[in-house]
Amino acid sequence: KILKKLELDVMIPKKQLCCGAPAYFTGAFDTVDYLAKKNIEYFETWIDEVDAVIIPEATCSAMIKQDWEHYFHNQPEWKARAKKLSEKIFMATKWLENNTDLKNLLASSGKKFDELVTYHDPCHAKKMQGIWQEPRNLLKQNYVLKEMSDSNRCCGFGGVTMQTEKYDFAKAAG
């Protein structure tokens, strides 16, 4: 709904595979190689037709924007192809705040909430991509935003830490 209000043409890639982050973090590099190459080949079929690829999730956007290029450090052709794609890859909050009128749209919506909210930065947003102010700027348009104490503290998820080292917590959470 928001993208329509911003009058953006949206294309949802139907054949995109997993970005490969879970495999990358656990050392399953044959899987990373397969997934990244298949995605690069698929993205290349339409990337010149779009201005940007916006990804709402920090780990996937960091994987595609930065880690694919790093992963292919010994495969120059694939590294170059990943680098070319990375120029159009953006985390959604960064692109929407910097390239659209979303902040004004939210501010003029007439919706102001009294709830006090805080925002925890995903590590792959703040520490890898430098994205931390953009989500706050957008949230402040409709909410009272209060920074949490020790906002740089790790949430404990750590890529696949929750699934491996803290399996009982993950299972209990569902």
Regions found by a protein language model. Name each.
Residues 1-174:
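Iron-sulfur cluster-binding electron-transfer modules in prokaryotic oxidoreductases
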